[in-house]
């Protein structure tokens, strides 16, 4: 049905889905849920796909090493062209390593790897000392809820890492969110190539992004940060309310 509807490609992590899509002639993009973190894994999945979405836990230095190795070793996909690397640029982050969270599956029999995460990580939690039974005071009860990824203020470094596709969250988001985020990143990317990617413009774009749904922004792991940054509320920090 997807092929009949004219869908260009499917994002997949399950090997059976990947093989089925290839068999019926639908292009496959390898999902971040497969946790691709090195050139050897890229080589393997290059047998099935021309576009591979890397794990969200990599630094830009690691991303650049992979894109350079693709060029150096001429790693090609089914089309005969060099494999293209895609990374997440903006939106929600998982509290776990990409593709390795099973909280939703365990609690609700609803798998994140099948696009059905129940967002257990976005709830408030109480920390209990199991030996004494005492509750431990914590300054933020949203213990597993990461802030949203935002790469706009270092988008020049992202582009320079050699990626070909920037992935922006859209599923489950309102139309105003999608329109604002896509418009902002489109302007920023064009500005980079025009040589007008300035601090003043970045500040304006960041203000625009803050007007729509967000849990607060951070740079993810791209700039070498080892630990996550956590949201402090269950909803949006948007500067404009609907």
Q: Where do the model's predicted regions map?
A:
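Surface-exposed amphipathic alpha-helical tracts and adjacent flexible/coil segments at the periphery
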Residues: 1-3, 12, 27, 43-46, ...
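N-terminal active-site wall of soluble small-molecule enzyme domains
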Residues: 1-44
